[in-house]
């Protein structure tokens, strides 16, 4: 990530050792929770495979996450930024997970949703290819870092907004059956960690999108606590997976 001046966070120093420890601690925590976020939908897809149907689950969070991971992966490579290899590593793993989830969704969706999600998947790779081409062809290294950095902020905001349709479904059905708890909790913890990281670094590009993600995460967790009594999982512990 970059700070508001367009400098790589990896190349900046905050001065105070304690402050630096807090910054890097928040960043490492964010990476850990990001990995947890990537694996959190596994119970949902286990259910989809077991039932042979996507039911009312939405593929949009995984489509948005795939695009976000690809953009952040590109940002973390030396072609765009120096010293942020872990950004590329985490997001390459994330992209593989999101691609696997999307492919599974397509395999078990009805014909209409299969065509829709497949088209969106093609669009995602088309947009990413265009971003790579434009950033290499039209920008030098410094402006390329700014260009891709702003795109990563935009993609993060879109990714965090993707659960809005699920929030609407929860309110309409008064049930959290189709809002996986692991996904909501992991997004909240990841957002809080990176929000703290951005605030400690005074980095606009980090704390703004993750601040939005934190608010949305709180909303989802509040809705889960309020509506879980009306769900089929009512008799199950909060952190149980479907078996």
Curated annotation (Swiss-Prot):
The record's Pfam families line, in alphabetical order, gives: MtN3_slv
Q: Which GO terms describe its molecular function?
A: sugar transmembrane transporter activity
Check the record and name the InterPro entries matching this protein.
Answer: SWEET (IPR047664), SWEET_rpt (IPR004316)
State the gene name recorded for this protein. Answer: SWEET2A
What is the annotated quaternary arrangement, including any partners? Forms homooligomers and/or heterooligomers.
Cytoplasmic topological segments: 46-56, 112-118, 168-180, 225-243
Keyword annotations for this protein, in alphabetical order, are: Cell membrane, Membrane, Repeat, Signal, Sugar transport, Transmembrane, Transmembrane helix, Transport
Q: How does it sit in the membrane?
A: Multi-pass membrane protein
Biological process according to GO: carbohydrate transport
What spans does the record annotate as topological domain Extracellular, numbered to this chain? 16-24, 80-90, 140-146, 202-203
Designated name of the protein: Bidirectional sugar transporter SWEET2a
């Amino acid at each position: 990530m970059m700070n508001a001046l367009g400098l790589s966070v990896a190349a900046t120093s905050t001065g105070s050792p304690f402050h630096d420890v807090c910054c890097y601690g928040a960043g490492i925590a964010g990476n850990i929770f990001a990995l947890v976020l990537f694996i959190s939908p596994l119970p949902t897809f286990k259910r989809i495979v077991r039932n042979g149907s996507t039911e009312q689950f939405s593929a949009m969070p995984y489509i948005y996450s795939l695009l976000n991971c690809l953009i952040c992966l590109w940002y973390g490579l030396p072609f765009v930024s120096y010293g942020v290899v872990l950004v590329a590593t985490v997001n390459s793993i994330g992209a593989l997970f999101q691609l696997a989830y999307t492919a599974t969704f397509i395999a078990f969706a009805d014909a209409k949703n299969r065509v829709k999600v497949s088209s969106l998947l093609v669009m995602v790779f088309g947009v990413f290819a265009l971003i790579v081409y434009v950033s290499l062809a039209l920008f030098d290294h410094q402006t390329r870092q700014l260009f891709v950095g702003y795109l990563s902020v935009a993609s993060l905001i879109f990714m965090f907004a993707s659960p809005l349709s699920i929030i609407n479904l929860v309110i309409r059905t008064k049930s959290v059956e189709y809002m996986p708890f692991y996904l909501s909790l992991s997004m909240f913890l990841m957002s809080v960690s990176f929000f703290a990281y951005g605030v400690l670094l005074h980095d606009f590009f980090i704390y703004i999108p993750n601040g939005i993600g934190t608010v949305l995460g709180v909303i989802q967790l509040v809705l889960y606590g309020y509506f879980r009594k009306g769900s089929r999982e009512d008799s199950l512990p909060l952190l149980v997976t479907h078996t």
